[in-house]
Design a protein with these regions (language model features):
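N-terminal accessory scaffold of Fe(II)-dependent oxygenases
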Residues: 2-272, 279-364
Length: 364
């Protein structure tokens, strides 16, 4: 006998209840960096973990990370960097236009010297600026990314890898990024397909975290993409991307659904967060005493576990059948020529997130 939508919805509610029966309600905490074996166990548990006592800086490096002068000294005044510019601090988000239509809006990208950027940032007025290039701007190992990373000058002070994470994963970080902003910049809910090690150098970062299971409660829809441009009056406004422009799946709401129990993590200077792959997160920040909120993060490829992959797709199909239109259809696009999981499977049967996603498209 076919199940009606109300029965399927009840099963989904039971799924969340069963999850909460066993899921720890807050982030795990480690008072010192894990060994590679402990890190492997941490990854296997796939639960956010706050780590204290770790530093991504090279041994013997001593800098005052709260002040702009440090970044100008390391990068040089003349070399320009790519800066995301918005009017509301939401670099990647869904907006409702005057016509009532919604669109996924990317920031205007402007190039400016590190000195100009930091001067405008610490003035804390006008438009919101964020250094968030996220394509491995310090280090990168992603095939197809050409040229030297934009912030390669920071390699003299930032380690190439998190040693215990590298040894646990058996691979080097696919991307290492520097993020510089202030309290005006925030993110909407999104998830990244990479194991993430995130360290705060200056200020405070506040993460609102939802597990992949809780992600079934989010309203995610495909949106036509737009990019902020300057109008004739100099004001920023979204402009639709030229064709062919592929719709972007994104969550519009900045507030967690009522039925979920988000984990809130507040990272202070010197704290590190291990954020498992595919956990949804919204990030807010506060600048430190020098007017800056700064972090370094490492993305590691995540092995796709067959049972988790299959069960999550099954849950998505159930959610769609129950009428949850905000859950993406896992079977959409399966008839095109983009290939399937067999196309990215290694000879040992393993599949990693590195085979399916480009880090430059994630994590803003």
């Amino acid at each position: 006998m076919a199940l009606n939508k109300s029965t399927l919805e009840a099963h989904l509610e039971d799924l969340i209840t069963d999850y909460y029966d066993l899921q720890f309600p807050s982030a795990f905490k480690l008072n010192e960096p894990p060994s590679p074996l402990e890190a492997l166990r941490m990854i296997s548990k796939s639960h956010p973990t706050v780590i204290r006592g770790y530093s991504p800086l090279r041994e013997g490096v001593s800098r005052e990370w709260r002040v702009p002068a440090t970044y100008i000294e390391l990068h040089g005044n003349g070399t320009e960097v790519a800066i995301a510019v918005t009017d509301d601090g939401l670099a990647d988000s869904v907006r409702t236009l005057g016509s009532g239509e919604t669109t996924f809006v990317k920031p205007l990208e402007e190039r400016m010297s590190m000195t100009t950027f930091l001067s405008k940032l610490t003035a804390n007025g006008g438009e919101a600026l964020y250094l968030q290039s996220q394509d491995g701007n310090i280090y990168r190992s992603q095939p197809g990314m050409r040229g030297e990373p934009e912030l390669a000058s920071f390699q003299q002070v930032v380690e190439r890898d998190v040693a215990w994470m590298r040894d646990a994963m058996g691979s080097t970080a696919v991307a290492v990024n520097l993020w510089i902003g202030n309290s005006r910049s925030t993110t909407s809910f999104h998830h990244d397909p990479y194991e993430n090690v995130y360290h705060v150098l200056s200020g405070v970062k506040r993460f609102t975290l939802l597990s992949p299971v809780e992600g079934l409660c989010l309203e995610q829809h495909f949106q036509p993409p737009s990019t902020l441009v300057r109008g004739v009056d100099g004001e920023l406004q979204p402009e639709r991307d030229p064709e062919p422009a592929h719709p972007v799946p994104w969550v519009q709401s900045l507030v967690p659904p009522r039925e979920v129990r988000p984990i809130i993590v507040e990272l202070e200077e010197g704290d590190t967060l291990y954020l498992p792959a595919d956990w949804w997160h919204k990030v807010e920040q506060e600048e430190g005493s020098g007017g800056l909120a700064v972090a370094v993060n490492y993305w590691y490829t995540s092995e796709l576990r067959p049972e988790r992959y299959a069960l999550l797709r099954f849950a998505q199909r159930v959610a769609r059948s129950a009428g949850r239109e905000g859950v993406l259809d896992p079977d959409a696009g399966m008839d095109d020529d983009s290939g399937d999981i067999d196309d990215v499977m290694f000879s040992d049967g393993s599949v990693t997130s590195d085979d399916e996603w480009d880090p430059s498209e994630w994590g803003r």
